[in-house]
Amino acid sequence: MAGTSSQRLAARVREIIARLDAAYGIPQWRPHGDATSELVLTILSQNTSDTNSGRAFARLLRRYPSWDAVAAAPLPELIETIQPGGLAPTKAPRIQAALREIKERTGGYDLSLLKDMPLEEARAWLGGIHGVGPKTVACVLMFALGRPVMPVDTHVFRVASRLGLVPSRAGNAAMTPEKAHFLLESIVPPEGFHAFHLGLIKHGRRTCTAQRPRCPDCPLLDLCPAAARYHPELRPARRRPASARPTR
């Protein structure tokens, strides 16, 4: 029975990916750049939009000629530089600490050693950097190094939860995006990680929004057990038992 259940779940995931590809286009694989740049950009992207984090990253690159310069910059100056990305007083020291640790551990800023390292070792290596969590680790490994991992941001977590792919609890504790990384990696085929990740992000931004999801327009409507919670009119009509029907 477990094998049959797993097969059904795998088929459902493939159907979700196919429908999202049809609705939003098939995501094209485009490596974002070197791994250290991806690490810094992902830290900047925390709790803000892509537009804001992109502006902050562009300002950082314009002001500083090297990662050494970023690591050595006066903290108030770096905070001012990345201000458009939000939470700059938190992100600036986190970026500097990460860069200094990479330099100390590698002698430079080249993280290509992670490309051929066993995957779990690469995860542990990156996750051992102070302030680098599972999402940042996954983004660096997937987008910069092409490793088969599943980044889970708020959009991916929300959509996957509503689709019933992620349970509300993990043991005695609430499920979180951090815990969902490994769960989703176990049910999504590795060749589908990239399409699944980007498809759920697009879907979460355009249709399955945090507030007022547009369920009637959703290409996954018939696959989603949560739709009727937000749009009661979508709940299937319940047939009354024969004993409750009026007699003629």
Please report, for each region that a protein language model flagged, where it lies by residue:
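Long, low-complexity, intrinsically disordered segments
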Residues: 244-248
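Catalytic cores of DNA base-excision repair glycosylases
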Residues: 3-241
